[in-house]
A protein has these predicted regions:
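Hydrophobic/aromatic residues positioned on beta-strands within the core alpha/beta folds
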Residues: 97-98
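Non-catalytic signal-transmission and effector/linker regions of two-component phosphorelay proteins
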Residues: 1-20, 119-132
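Active-site residues of response regulator receiver
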Residues: 68
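Two-component/phosphorelay signaling modules centered on CheY-like receiver
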Residues: 26-45
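Acidic, metal-coordinating helix/loop segments flanking the phosphotransfer/catalytic sites
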Residues: 46-64
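Acidic catalytic/metal-coordinating carboxylates
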Residues: 49, 75-78
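Conserved acidic carboxylate
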Residues: 23
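The feature encodes the CheY-like receiver
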Residues: 72
Length: 132
């Protein structure tokens, strides 16, 4: 997997909203990228670990973060905390995905948790509610 993948967006929206997806599993990342590109008017950007996410936010200001909980180098909650501390993302919504979610940590940070596996319709509805 490339360190930063972008999928051409087939929808037309102005200004284009950006979703940063942080997922280390290549097959899940590709599926999320394809789904977001085909089913939403948003521009998905895929990275596969927390450090790449921290670099990606320097060149783009995402309107939504979607991150896996279990990532190499730092987990999704640690990434969320670093983004809040080091960048201006206090109002940017975030979804954290995992088969195992530490519910107390998710609630404390007011994150939206999605348990894997999840239904694509539920995933897309959650995105629409958060990014409007």
């Amino acid at each position: 997997m490339q360190s930063l993948q972008q999928q051409p967006n087939t929808h037309n929206s102005s200004p284009e909203k950006i979703i940063l997806v942080v997922e280390d599993d290549d097959s899940i990342g590709s599926m999320l990228l394809e789904t977001l590109s085909q089913e939403t008017p948003y521009k998905p950007v895929l990275v596969n670990d927390g450090f790449q996410a921290l670099q990606a936010v320097r060149s783009t200001k995402p309107d939504l973060f979607i991150t896996d909980y279990r990532l190499p180098n730092m987990n999704g909650i640690e990434l969320y905390d670093r983004l809040r501390r080091t960048h201006d993302f206090d109002d940017t919504p975030a979804i954290i995905m995992s088969a195992y979610l530490p519910e107390d940590e998710v609630r404390k940070r007011r994150l939206i948790g999605l348990s894997k596996p999840f239904e694509i319709d539920e995933f897309l509805e959650t995105i629409e509610k958060l990014i409007q």
